[in-house]
């Protein structure tokens, strides 16, 4: 079958002929319909041999693509709750199902599949969806019935990772509180939607692009500010010098992390799914007292079910830029150059 692989670290992906996978008794063979492309794919391609977080933890030579949707092509003998032709999405985080984390329902931290700071996933250490077919255990699938797989592909990482990074805020946000979302890209745009749908907090969006700030307002942000040296002063003005109760930083650079800790209130919460490798000093007089700081990793299958349900109810704005399988290099280049309007999605023939 045709596929697109990361053959070696520090190289662009390559088209390859790969064996068609065969499902075991507890597996499902998926005919891939759509695969979203992610900036982390570029990070893997750009990784130097032995470098963190990818090349130091896993081996190259796997099929890329961790935002995968498709239809059931064939079923293992013990899989009885799906039918051929049913639309499904893949929860890409690998998990054993038996370790303490899996039993606690936080399988993104699975001890068996954790390597350094990352969890091994479809398209990151294991073959992903940029191929005609993909075999996964039944436990890694969420059914979407007869929904369009193309629109659901970006929800399997961009959507659900944003959702998971905001879950503590969903539970704790109260009317009158402020939430700062830094970075209104593929993930941050979903975070604004989830926060608008599931909380009554006032949302401040921060980005260095006026175009993305306009999008944030369309998606439900109450305020939109440019990320620059004046960001803290602008947030102080908006909040009457109270600061914000929660921050979600989808960038993770030195500058954005410093902004986050400088504006969060006592007993506030900073969630950092962004992976730009920034650092920040924490300590007395450097961050508000009793504030919590969390590096957010991945999501759970239940998170994906909840996100898909919101999509089925028509509550999410899902924007995709469609490319054919033959256009994968061009799609990645447009992602690298920042020329996409929506999430790049490879639509299979």
Residue ranges and their predicted role:
Residues 269-271, 281-320:
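Rossmann-fold dehydrogenase core element
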Residues 258-262, 304-349:
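C-terminal hydrophobic helical "lid"/dimerization subdomain
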Residues 85, 176, 221, 243-244, ...:
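Local beta-strand N-terminus motif with an aromatic residue
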């Amino acid at each position: 079958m045709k596929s697109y692989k990361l053959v070696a670290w520090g190289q662009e992906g390559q088209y390859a002929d790969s064996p068609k996978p065969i499902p075991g008794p507890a597996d499902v063979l998926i005919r891939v319909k759509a695969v979203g492309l992610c900036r982390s794919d570029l990070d893997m391609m750009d990784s130097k041999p032995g470098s963190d977080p990818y090349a130091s933890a896993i081996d190259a030579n796997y099929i890329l693509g961790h935002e995968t949707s498709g239809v059931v092509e064939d079923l293992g003998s013990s899989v009885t709750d799906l039918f051929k032709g049913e639309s499904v999405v893949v929860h890409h985080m690998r998990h054993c199902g038996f370790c303490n984390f899996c039993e606690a329902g936080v399988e993104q931290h699975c001890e068996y599949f954790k390597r350094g700071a990352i969890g091994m996933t479809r398209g990151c250490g294991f073959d992903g969806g940029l191929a005609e077919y993909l075999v996964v255990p039944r436990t890694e699938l969420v059914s979407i019935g007869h929904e369009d797989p193309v629109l659901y592909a970006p929800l399997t990482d961009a959507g659900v990772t944003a959702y998971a990074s905001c879950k503590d805020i969903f539970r704790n946000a109260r009317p009158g509180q402020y939430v700062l979302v830094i970075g209104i890209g593929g993930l941050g745009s979903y975070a604004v939607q989830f926060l608008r749908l599931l909380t009554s907090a006032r949302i401040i969006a921060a980005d260095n692009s006026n175009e993305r700030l306009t999008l944030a307002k369309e998606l439900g942000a109450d305020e939109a500010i440019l990320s620059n040296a004046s960001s803290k002063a602008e947030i102080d003005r908006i909040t009457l010098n109270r600061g914000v109760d929660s921050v979600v930083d989808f960038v993770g650079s030195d500058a954005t992390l410093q902004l986050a800790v400088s504006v969060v209130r006592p007993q506030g919460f900073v969630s950092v799914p962004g992976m730009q490798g920034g650092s920040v000093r924490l300590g007395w007089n450097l961050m508000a007292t009793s504030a919590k700081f969390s590096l957010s990793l991945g999501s759970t299958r239940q998170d994906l079910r909840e996100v898909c349900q919101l999509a089925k109810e028509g509550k999410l704005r899902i924007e995709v830029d469609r490319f054919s399988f033959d256009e994968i290099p061009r799609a990645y280049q447009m992602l690298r150059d920042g020329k996409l309007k929506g999430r790049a999605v490879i639509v299979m023939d």
